[in-house]
Amino acid sequence: MEFIINKINNIKNNNDNNNNINNNSNNNNNNNNNSNNNKFKFKYEFEFGYCYDVNLYEWRFIQDYETVPLKLNGILSNDEYNSILNIIGDVYDKTDKYPHVTYLLSIIMMVLLCMLPSVMAIHSNLNSYIQFVLFDDIFILITFILIPFLFFLKKKVIIENNYVIKGLKNRSIKLNIEYYKFKLLYFFFLLLWVPQGFLQSLIYKKRVLNEDFFNLKISLFILLGIDLIFILFAIWNFLLFTKLNRFLIKDRRDENILITLNSNIKKFLSPMEFYLTCNNTLNFFLNNNDNHFFPIDLDDPNV
């Protein structure tokens, strides 16, 4: 009888030990899950805000690291701070007080460049052999220039900047940027240039060499479709940057026009940044009178 009782007690003890082991393992799993969740929580979050005050455009780019408010309490190193400034500088020249002018001129130059093959195709007064040689040489030259530039643009904008952002993320610092639409717009039009030039080259070969290795009508329709994208984009941008029949460059100092343009850009393309703010631990406000950042004491009852 005692043997049976001892056996039962041993079984109970073993079950209790197993339960304790399971509970401990569950607790460890929960702790690991919690640590993994906390791992991706940011202590600090930096954002680029939009400029709504036309008088503060020159402050879109914040100060040097030595003059930044409280030096960000040592959160960012000098190299990290300069990396962020380089990301901002990829969008606009830091000395440009009117980003809308820079943006519009860049769009105009881009559209004119991309429509060059169509202009050459329409110009039919040239001798066909001259057209063929001239266009083929230009297309080959520009293609060999653009293809490396496409890879450089991808590396510079997407890979390098993401490397900086991930590096900050590992230090629990989040950096929010909203300008990829603007940069990828260039990337999109450069990609359109290559098939357009290739089709145009085939058309010239068809005219000069009279080769039947492709369908001329289909190529022409595709080419016209690409050109139509360029034309519609140019018209859309002209309407976007036009206010009451007055062109941006002519009245670029008109505050009402600039405010309207700024609103349109933010709504449609979001290419512009203004200043760097830090949420959570650090908080700043911008004094409109003397254009300086001041820290906000969240514990102050007057705030």
UniProtKB/Swiss-Prot annotation:
Subcellular location: Membrane
Chief location bin: membrane
Keyword Cytoplasm in annotation: no
Transmembrane segments: 102-122, 132-152, 184-204, 221-241
Alphabetical UniProt keywords: Membrane, Transmembrane, Transmembrane helix
Mode of membrane association: Multi-pass membrane protein
GO cellular component: membrane
Official protein name in the record: Putative uncharacterized transmembrane protein DDB_G0285385
Species assigned in the record: Dictyostelium discoideum
Organism ancestry: Eukaryota, Amoebozoa, Evosea, Eumycetozoa, Dictyostelia
